[in-house]
C-alpha cells in the first residue's frame, strides 16, 4: 500500500480519484490547493507519492511549484503530474526529476498503469506487502 497525497482543485475529480485509489489499497490524503497540500505534507511523514494537478485554482503551474517544495522537504518523494492543458516543453522541463505525467482525461486503467510502470506501485505488490 502506498500513501498518496492527491492535489486536485476539481472537487468531483478529487473525490472520485481518492475513492478509487482507496479501493486499490492506498492511503489517500487530499487537498484542493497548494497551501492545503503543504500543510498535509508537513503532518504526514509516511507519504510516498504526490499526485498533483499542474494548475490549481487558477494558479498556472502551482502544482509544479508544490512538487519542488515537496521534493525539497522529502527528496525520495515520487511525483505524478496531471493536467488537461497542453504543456510546452519549457513547462515540462520544470517538472522535478524522476517524475511522470498523466494527461487528463485519464481512465482508471491508465492511472494504474502509470503507478505500476513509473513508480512500481501495483495492487499485487500491495497485497504481497500486506500479507507478509
Residue ranges and their predicted role:
Residues 11-29:
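Two-component/phosphorelay signaling modules centered on CheY-like receiver
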Residues 51-68:
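Conserved phosphotransfer microenvironments
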Residues 8, 83:
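Conserved acidic carboxylate
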Residues 30-49, 57:
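Acidic, metal-coordinating helix/loop segments flanking the phosphotransfer/catalytic sites
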Residues 92-102:
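As written
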Residues 42-45, 69-76, 94:
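Conserved phosphotransfer cores of two-component systems
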Amino acid at each position: 500500500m502506498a500513501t498518496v497525497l492527491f492535489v486536485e482543485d476539481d472537487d468531483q475529480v478529487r473525490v472520485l480519484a481518492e475513492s478509487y485509489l482507496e479501493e486499490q489499497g492506498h492511503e489517500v490524503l487530499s487537498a484542493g490547493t497548494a497551501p492545503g497540500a503543504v500543510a498535509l505534507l508537513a503532518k504526514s511523514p509516511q507519504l510516498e507519492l504526490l499526485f498533483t494537478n499542474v494548475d490549481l485554482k487558477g494558479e498556472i503551474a502551482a502544482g509544479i511549484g508544490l512538487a519542488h517544495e515537496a521534493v525539497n522537504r522529502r527528496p525520495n518523494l515520487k511525483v505524478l503530474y496531471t493536467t488537461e492543458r497542453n504543456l510546452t516543453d519549457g513547462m515540462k522541463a520544470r517538472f522535478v526529476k524522476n517524475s511522470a505525467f498523466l494527461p487528463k482525461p485519464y481512465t482508471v486503467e491508465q492511472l494504474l498503469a502509470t503507478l505500476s510502470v513509473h513508480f512500481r506501485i501495483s495492487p499485487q505488490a500491495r497485497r504481497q506487502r500486506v500479507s507478509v
